[in-house]
Amino acid sequence: MMIMKVKEVMNKDFIKISPNDIGGEVVQTLYKEKKNYAPVIEDGKLVGWITALDLLIGCKHSKIEDLMLLIDEIKILKENDEVTDELIDEIIKNEDIAYPVINDRDEVVGTLSVFDLLKYYKNR
């Protein structure tokens, strides 16, 4: 497997959700953008992660902060991490769709999804 950095594969054009956003509005945004996930960001920093499944079981009137996964409940990638066989195996084992990607200042700079990896490998 060719070693590459997360930042070479990640999606830099991602949806940014606030903890104060309302579930129903986020559902519409995700649907419109054809996404199943989004980082929850406050002051440029990752504070959580929301998925379509979280929204499905939550209330459309709830704030995202009440529905999101907290940062200690998710895997966070750094943009200079390497995409290794171990990472790929972890994605497969956990059936994860995507991860948030941060830089050295803990600012969200992108997301890495299974689809980003597939596109990268297809276009090599």
UniProtKB/Swiss-Prot annotation:
GO terms for molecular function: DNA binding. Residues 10-67, 70-124 form the CBS domain. Disulfide bonds: none annotated. Gene3D superfamilies: CBS-domain. Keywords: CBS domain, DNA-binding, Repeat. SUPFAM superfamilies: CBS-domain pair. SMART domains: CBS. It holds the Pfam family CBS. Exhibits a pH-dependent oligomerization state: at pH 7, the dominant species is a dimer, where each monomer is a two-CBS domain protein, and at pH 4.5-4.8, the dominant species is a tetramer, with an oblong shape. At pH 2.5, there is formation of intermolecular hydrogen bonds, suggesting the presence of high-molecular weight species. The physiological dimeric species is thermal and chemically very stable. The CBS domains bind adenosine derivatives (AMP, ATP, NADP and SAM). The CBS domains can also bind calf-thymus DNA and E-boxes recognized by transcription factors. Binding of the nucleotides induces protein conformational changes. This is CBS domain-containing protein MJ0729. The lineage of its organism: Archaea, Methanobacteriati, Methanobacteriota, Methanomada group, Methanococci.
